[in-house]
Amino acid sequence: AFSQAHEESGFDKVLVGYTSSSADGFIVAMHAAAHTKKLGYLIAHRPGFVSPTILARKAATFDQLTQGRIALHIISGGGDTEQRRDGDYENHDSRYQRSGEFMKILKDLWTRSNPVTHDGHFYKFENAKSDFQCFQTPHIPIYFGGASEAALNVGAESCDVYALWGEPIKDVKKKIADFRKRVKVTGRDPRAVR
């Protein structure tokens, strides 16, 4: 009923959050999607415990079954106490580096036709492939946020949509301008990131 109310009110997408004590966002979103026709689901995911190869297939499956009603919001984590509830002892900057590697892997898995091998700092796998591709092209949109230097730099390198808090417009304009400069430094087109 909650998701139906959002759809009837004209929302295009709703956030399904993530905490160390919340219900599984994919299961919640899939249940809600079965009871709506158009509403999209921005599913929050925190890298660290689910392999990017598994999440890539899981998200692509959801994307196909709902004909493109998914986006992912990659969250690097809250405070250390929240992280440790799930057994994650990486420090703040390391968590952001892990998120950057995770997002790159997702995009590689979703856009390459050949098997993918990766030997990175946080993840290692050989010849990963999926027989299930994304419905959306070129891939499922990846949202990302954060205000620290680590977050801004990782987001500039990897995300499709940079999420901001609701703040005064003049502050948001400054943040957007700064973020676009960071995107340009990475060699990406700032207009390609929303």
Regions found by a protein language model. Give the residues of each.
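Short, acidic/polar
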Residues: 1-5, 55-58, 144-154
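Glycine-enriched alpha-helix->loop->beta-strand junction motifs that scaffold or abut catalytic
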Residues: 10, 35-39, 66, 156-162
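Active-site-adjacent beta->alpha loops and helix N-cap segments on the catalytic face
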Residues: 22-29, 168-183
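Conserved, mostly hydrophobic/aromatic
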Residues: 6, 10, 32, 62, ...
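Alpha-helix-loop-beta-strand connector modules within alpha/beta enzyme cores
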Residues: 25-46, 98-105, 185-186, 190
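Flexible, glycine-rich active-site loops centered on histidine and acidic residues
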Residues: 1, 49-117, 165-177
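Hydrophobic faces of well-ordered beta-strands that scaffold small-molecule active sites
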Residues: 14-16, 40-45, 70-74, 142-145, ...
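N-terminal beta1-alpha1-beta2 module of alpha/beta enzyme domains
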Residues: 1-36, 40, 133, 137-140
